[in-house]
Structures are given as structure tokens and as C-alpha cells.
């Protein structure tokens, strides 16, 4: 695999170095195409073996809209491949004898060719699927590493303009998953949303969770305040 090494020096700038490595999977010694991995299909309850790059076609199709810029799709392909290799190389993260599963709440979103054809239609298959395949093929074998090991690329759709430190969202602190400004998120389709809830409904929800809470819909504004924020600005 080609590794794109991330370093976290004392200064804020992060450096990325691309280098060649066959530590994890060497295409030349596996077969002429690419290595096979075991995937647990949570819909069928069965494990299937699949070419890793073919698997990534289905992941990329499910994780990112095909009308996004090709470079964004390539970046997503590298992140998804890195995630897959990390799961493959860490025994504790495997389940049901497989490296990954098709359940996006546990691993990554995955749509088979048949599912894509049924849900998106023939026109999408003809016009957009080739772009998905190009993004995967153009980055074939590329993963991101830190200190010589595949990183845990906990990617997500959209931030509020600044990402979070990993421990603010998950239980583990990773030196390469630090809060940074992400100003381009404002162009994302899901950047901002508004949810309106009545004082009565909020009171009901709070009391259903905290039965001993002393609060009423009449004094919400005086009893609710922001106590602290994360480095990323989240409440």
C-alpha cells in the first residue's frame, strides 16, 4: 500500500508525506487485482468475500453524493480504505469473522451494485457510477498512517465550521484527530438546520429523562444556560 504519513509537530501545521509500503497489503503478492476481505452483510446475515476496491465502490456510493467534486470523492475513498485496513489489521475490531460489516451505524455505509441499480436507477449507473469507480481506482492502495500504522479515520459529514477533538465525541484521544478550523463546511448542504420545540414539550422531555428535575415551562429561560463548550465550540 501507499501510505500518506501524517505527522503532528508542535506547530499547528500538519504535514503529509506519501511513501511506498507493502507492510499491510501488497497487491503484487496477492493477485493481479487487489486483496480480498471478509464482509458481514447485516441484511442477509451472511459473510461474503470481496475485492477490497470493489467493496469501496459500494462504500463511496453510500457515503458521499456522486455529484461532489472528484477530488472530494478521492479523499473519501482514501479515508474509507484506511478505515477498512485499520479494521482488518486490528483483531479486536473484527466481528462475525469479518473485517467490516455493511451497517453504517457500526462500520461504513455500503450499497451493492444491485442495490444502487434498484434505488438510483439505470441512468445513475451509466452517468455517475463511473465517477465513483474513478475515485476509487485513482487512489488504489492508498491509506493514511501515523507512526507507521493505519489511522482511525473517524470521518463525518459536516462540522459547524470547526472539528472536534476525538475524545469530545468518542472515548479515545488520538493525536492526529485534533480540533481544527473547517471553514469550507459552510458550503455543505447540511451545514445549518433549525429545530423548534415548545416550552411545554421541552419540559416534558427533560422530566422524562430527569425525573427529579425542578423546572417548569414558565421559567425555562432563567434555568437553562450553557455551562461550557468543547474546543470545537460544541455545547
What are these model-derived regions, one by one?
Residues 1-235:
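Conserved, single-site charged/polar hotspot
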Amino acid at each position: 500500500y501507499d501510505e500518506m504519513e501524517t505527522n503532528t509537530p508542535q506547530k499547528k501545521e500538519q504535514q503529509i508525506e506519501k511513501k511506498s509500503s507493502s507492510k499491510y497489503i501488497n497487491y503484487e503478492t496477492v493477485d493481479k487485482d487487489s486483496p480480498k476481505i471478509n464482509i458481514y452483510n447485516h441484511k442477509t446475515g451472511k459473510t461474503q468475500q470481496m475485492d477490497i476496491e470493489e467493496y469501496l465502490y459500494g462504500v463511496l456510493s453510500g457515503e458521499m453524493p456522486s455529484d461532489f467534486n472528484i477530488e472530494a470523492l478521492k479523499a473519501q475513498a482514501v479515508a474509507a480504505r484506511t478505515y477498512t485496513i485499520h479494521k482488518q489489521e486490528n483483531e479486536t475490531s473484527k466481528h462475525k469473522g469479518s473485517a467490516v460489516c455493511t451497517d453504517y451505524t457500526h462500520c461504513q455505509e455500503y450499497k451493492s451494485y444491485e442495490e444502487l441499480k434498484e434505488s438510483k436507477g439505470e441512468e445513475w449507473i451509466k452517468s455517475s457510477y463511473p465517477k465513483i469507480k474513478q475515485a476509487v481506482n485513482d487512489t488504489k492502495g492508498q491509506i493514511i498512517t501515523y507512526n507507521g500504522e493505519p489511522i482511525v479515520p473517524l470521518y463525518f459529514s459536516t462540522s459547524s465550521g470547526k472539528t472536534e477533538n476525538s475524545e469530545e465525541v468518542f472515548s479515545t484521544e488520538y493525536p492526529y484527530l485534533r480540533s481544527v478550523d473547517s471553514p469550507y463546511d459552510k458550503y455543505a448542504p447540511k451545514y445549518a438546520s433549525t429545530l423548534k420545540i415548545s416550552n411545554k414539550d421541552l419540559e416534558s422531555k427533560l422530566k422524562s429523562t430527569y425525573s427529579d428535575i425542578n423546572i417548569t415551562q414558565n421559567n425555562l429561560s432563567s434555568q437553562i444556560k450553557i455551562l461550557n463548550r468543547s474546543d470545537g465550540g460544541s455545547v
